[in-house]
Every structure is written in C-alpha cells, then in structure tokens.
From Swiss-Prot:
One of its GO terms (molecular function) is structural constituent of ribosome. Signal peptide: none annotated. The modification Phosphoserine is found at residues 232-233. Belongs to the eukaryotic ribosomal protein eS6 family. It comes from the Eukaryota. Phosphorylated. This is Small ribosomal subunit protein eS6. It comes from Eremothecium gossypii (strain ATCC 10895 / CBS 109.51 / FGSC 9923 / NRRL Y-1056) (Yeast). Gene3D superfamilies: 1.20.5.2650. Keywords: Phosphoprotein, Ribonucleoprotein, Ribosomal protein.
Length: 236
C-alpha cells in the first residue's frame, strides 16, 4: 500500500510505499477523519499523529466520506456531491465509490500530519514549499498583513516575477472587491439612472393614462351625439 503523507503547515506532500502489510494494519477498520498514532507504522514516525483523509482502491475508485462500508457501492450523485462532477445542469448519475472504512483492498491511503514527531521526515517536514500566489480579495489581503480600513491595499498586493526571454517583469493579480472612489461614483451614477428611469416611466404612464381618459371621453361624446342624431331623425 502507498501512503500519501501531507504536511499542510509546510505545504509539502510525499508518497511512501509500504510493502509490509503488518505496518499498515493499524489503519484497518478505521474511518476517514479518524486519527492514528504514527509509531505503529514505523519507528521513523514516532510521536507523529496521522489523520486519515481518504484514498483509492486497487481499481482507482475513491473513498467517500459518510459511506460506512469497507466495500464498493453505487450511489446516485448530483451537483455538490464529492467524487462527482456533473457535465450538464441538473444532471444526476449513479457512480461507484469506495466506502469510508479502510481495508486491505486499498492501493493508496491519504494521510495528514496533525502532530509532528521527534524525527524529521525526508521531503515532508524538513522542506517548505511557499505559496505561489498571495491573497486576491481586498479583505483577505487586509487580514493577511493586519491592515486597517484606512490603509491602501494596492501597496501590499503580492507581486511575482515573470521571466519572458531576456525581459523580467512583475505581475500582480487584480484585487477583487476593492472599494475605490471610482467604484462609489459608478454606484451613485447607476442609482441615479435607476431613479431617473423610474421617474420617466411613471411620467410616461401618467401621460398615457391621461391620453386614454381623453380618448374615452371623446368616444363617449361621439356615441352620445350619434344617439341624439338618430333619435331626432326617428321623431321627424
């Protein structure tokens, strides 16, 4: 069985192959989300605590949280369900998934280090992979640098260097949800347009109602005149 061990603190992960079944037997009958003492896996993991995050069986079917079985099942899945990505709107599909209980039929088991042990694990705890991209949303940049609302977020956005041929230039993401005077002005303009359009519609509706009432009055007067004319011709 392969153990895919990740360490979110450093942003690293590594796959370790374990040939001895006795070493991975400690994970059997455990569920996704449960924690396991690393000392049972090997002396190099002494003091470590692993959390089971998921895995795949030997045919490549993923483990699904909430399916309390050590076997494979077929479930009807819709949008928002893990292990399924709909291709069309409203599409549902019955798909095979592996239960959340660990067994010997697994090929890969994903583990997360929740507590670091005494020794360093080569390629996982002794290395650090910095995040390639910084925060993009204005509030997240403020939170990241501990800024107040008065500080200008644009000065703190994380830029990255891009080398293209002989030229080296920096690139920064477009800050999302950034409140600027231009944005406030645009909002005021849109609100004023909305009010102006509503007023114009009300005036047009009132004008139409007035015209309609005038036409109805004229029609009534014409009909009354016609009735009067007929009555006078009958008398004659």
């Amino acid at each position: 069985m392969k153990l895919n061990i990740s360490y979110p603190v450093n942003g690293t992960q590594k796959t370790i192959e374990v040939d001895d079944e006795h070493r991975v037997r400690v994970f059997y009958d455990k569920r996704i989300g449960q924690e396991v003492n690393g000392e049972a896996v090997g002396d190099e993991f002494k003091g470590y605590v692993f959390k089971i995050a998921g895995g795949n069986d030997k045919q490549g079917f993923p483990m699904k949280q909430g399916v309390l079985l050590p076997t494979r099942v077929k479930l009807l899945m819709a949008k928002g369900t893990s292990c399924y990505r709909p291709r069309r709107n409203g599409e549902r599909k019955r798909k095979s998934v592996r239960g959340a209980i660990v067994g010997p039929d697994l090929a890969v088991l994903a583990l997360i280090i929740t507590k670091k042990g005494d020794q360093e694990i080569e390629g996982i705890t002794n290395e650090s992979v910095p995040k390639r991209l910084g925060p993009k949303r204005a509030n997240n940049i403020r939170k990241f640098f501990g800024l107040t609302k008065d500080d200008d977020v644009r000065d703190f956005v994380i830029r990255r260097e891009v080398v293209k041929g002989d030229k080296t230039y920096t690139k920064a993401p477009k800050i999302q949800r950034l409140v600027t005077p231009q944005r406030l002005q645009r909002k005021r303009h849109q609100r004023a347009l909305k009010v102006r359009n509503a007023q114009a519609q009300r005036e047009a509706a009132a004008e139409y109602a007035q015209l309609l009432a005038k036409r109805l009055t004229e029609k009534k007067a014409e009909k009354a005149e016609e009735r009067k004319r007929r009555a006078s011709s009958l008398k004659a």
